[in-house]
Amino acid sequence: MVCLAAFSAQAAETKKVDVLLVGGGIMSSTLGVWLHELEPDWSMMMVERLDGVAQESSNGWNNAGTGHSALAELNYTPEKSNGKIDISKAVEINEGFQVTRQFWTYQVKTGVLKNPRSFINSTPHMSFVWGEDNVRYLKKRYEALQASPLFRGMQFSDDYDQISKWVPLMMEGRDRSQKVAATWMPVGTDVNFGEITRQFVGYLQSQPQFTLSLSSEVRDIKRNDDGTWRVSYVNLKSGDRQDVDTKFLFIGAGGGALRLLQASGIPEARDFAAFPVGGSFLVTENPEVVNRHLAKAYGKASVGSPPMSVPHLDTRVIDGKRIILFGPFATFSTKFLKNGSYMDLFGSTTSHNVMPMLHVGVDEFPLVQYLAGQLMLSDEDRFNALKEYFPLAKKEDWRLWQAGQRVQIIQRDEAKGGILKLGTQIVKSKDGTIAGLLGASPGASTAAPIMLGVLETVFKDKLATPAWQQKVRQMIPTYGIKLNDNPAKVYEEWVATAEALQLSPPPRIDLRVTPAAPAAKPAAGAAQQAKPAKATADIAL
């Protein structure tokens, strides 16, 4: 736990702040806004190694832009050995995104975020499958999700003509005898996390207590005798070195977070290793194609392939322009960041984490096979994969785009030696003076609850005060409420956030129906605690 007070007179050679944020992406900016709302007098600094914020994973071109709420992503609803569909993870993810919607709604109402359609747009989410077994699974999934108010309004169809009305490009040219099925959820969203980041940081820059340092790379992290942290960084343009002392240090540096946590020397970082996986997409900007597809259509991984291989045909709105992406196709580089170093993987390997990495390499051999196969894909192979979703696609309309890097978490495990984890993980010191975020999807979509989880663990005493409680509930009206158990609250907040964010209105919810699905853990802390039955990699935010 950390109790912050303003520093006294600053030493000339060392800047002193209450909070230092390393990394200029969606996570650091979200935490910065949280803390400024709760403690507007605290001094705060953000350090970013590139010459602008939101240029790595948060950049709209470096991720799939899905507002992850488990409406279409089939890997969140596995079929158990007894044939039943487990929706607990889907409920957890959806509850987390509802917190995010509420957080953004508050920021729109207070003027921190402006013009909602610049960063979020209604885009139906759909699952699309073919083959008898997959059609059967999707029908069972749809029926299981009806137990939760979070998924009311979802439609299921195995009728060629009905699906054609939803996604004509995906059905034209398809054999009508092929068994297909789809679910359709109109309340899905496409999100430009880069735009949100830029607006958040722009707001923070307007506050006198906030400082932004760009083109600044952290080179050293040491603990001071008084328990604070001294962070040394170098301006990559001038070569000047600067030290800053901080009472609380947050490392939201994406793929660079692990090495910085290791540099701090905290023992909690020793249990983790990382494995980088990149992603590429086929892109079209042809208006004749783009204007006839409005959906994020997720498929199902092929037999024997890991969930990360799930392809999707996505409508995107990036910087005001509508496009379509198809992918992802896995790529490999030893870089942990798109703008990183080829030595990143080797530099993060230590005597503490090398064995967990080797164990994962053996236990997750299907993933290794999948990555090897992806690296062998030709342009023709990728185009043929697209045609499974868009039968009449034309090569000349599409180009290949290299998106961002995702660093998958490998954690030491006493039973297995090491496990590959899906999702995000907060790693913090015992005294709570330093914390960092590792992992990937659903990441950005649940930035608000993940950062609220940081506040719950690092600033536990502060969060218990009436002042913080009142402010948090002002921003998150359902804080502490399990939405899955409260259909009335789901509908109330759905309506409020849809109106503020200029999104499609939600479906009516039958308040007499009591959900039978297992409730998720409180959304605020759930994201970093997620434990899927069989975790594997995910290369899209």
UniProtKB/Swiss-Prot annotation:
Its cofactor is FAD. GO terms for molecular function: 2-hydroxyglutarate dehydrogenase activity; L-malate dehydrogenase (quinone) activity. InterPro entries: FAD/NAD-bd_sf, MQO. Keywords: FAD, Flavoprotein, Oxidoreductase, Plasmid, Tricarboxylic acid cycle. It catalyses: (S)-malate + a quinone = a quinol + oxaloacetate. Its EC number is 1.1.5.4. Pathway: Carbohydrate metabolism; tricarboxylic acid cycle; oxaloacetate from (S)-malate (quinone route): step 1/1. GO terms for biological process: tricarboxylic acid cycle. Disulfide bonds: none annotated. The keyword Flavoprotein applies. The keyword Transferase does not apply. Residues 520-541 are annotated as: Disordered. PANTHER family: L-2-HYDROXYGLUTARATE DEHYDROGENASE, MITOCHONDRIAL (PTHR43104:SF2). Belongs to the MQO family. NCBIfam families: mal_quin_oxido, PRK05257.1-1, PRK05257.1-4, PRK05257.2-1, PRK05257.3-2, PRK13339.1. This is Probable malate:quinone oxidoreductase. It comes from Ralstonia nicotianae (strain ATCC BAA-1114 / GMI1000) (Ralstonia solanacearum). The gene is mqo.
